[in-house]
């Protein structure tokens, strides 16, 4: 395994050729500046000899068909392995769901991004590949963040692409963080990365980014970088800004961020989540409606069990509508413009 990686510098290829395990961990050094550790398939750590003050996690492929972030991360990994760039911050890359990537599908059995914060082990337990992998990913995050002295800034960007078109092509979900202000620096970092829209979540969830935020105090985000396309069919020029900013972060180059200003970004507050309670749940709008489409108060969004679900606020925008989820799961997130969020 070691020699294959040293020869190819292609960690994604190694991961997809061994989607369940790489066997024993292995490590090696790049020059005299970086120790590289491979903990398992899809799990690679870059430990600078003289690390600066940030611990950075870039995760991708939690959903197997969201390929642009996978290609983006593999490019950064390849540049690090080729020593075209040199890590100055401790950095962990996670390729989340290799089995689903090989399968060309979003999932194998279950949506992995609903299985963190221990949800993987709640009934029915570790019964499928996503649940088993989610538990392992939590352990890798724990090991990484606890592998350095306390007091360092912890960052986790969980990278995705969306299944549908969007009014705002790139957007981020800021996990619920009661008692903690939102980071102005992080919001402007996202903006510099081309991610000009942020959704503030209103309650705990079982997503990967919420896990890192809540358990480790990380500046963590679920970041949607565009639309789903098959591997190799992404227009990677659309991700130049994101790749550049991630590279600058990892290599400790100046970020040159603008001061925070609410008029430079689109800020939304999650006002509610609509879950599915009956098999006959259906939306009233077209199946191809774009993310952030707005509807007026009183508009019937959906019907189920003989009841109508209406827009409650003056206007509500929607993201991630999906009527085909299992009963009990989220069908859509409803948003309102965010007014004076606590950003510092």
From Swiss-Prot:
This is Succinylglutamate desuccinylase. Disulfide bonds: none annotated. It catalyses: N-succinyl-L-glutamate + H2O = L-glutamate + succinate. Its cofactor is Zn(2+). The keyword Ribosomal protein does not apply. The gene is astE. It holds the Pfam family AstE_AspA_hybrid. The lineage of its organism: Bacteria, Pseudomonadati, Pseudomonadota, Gammaproteobacteria, Alteromonadales. CDD domains: M14_ASTE. Belongs to the AspA/AstE family. Succinylglutamate desuccinylase subfamily. Keywords: Arginine metabolism, Hydrolase, Metal-binding, Zinc. PANTHER family: ASPARTOACYLASE, SUCCINYLGLUTAMATE DESUCCINYLASE. The active site is at residue 224. Pathway: Amino-acid degradation; L-arginine degradation via AST pathway; L-glutamate and succinate from L-arginine: step 5/5.
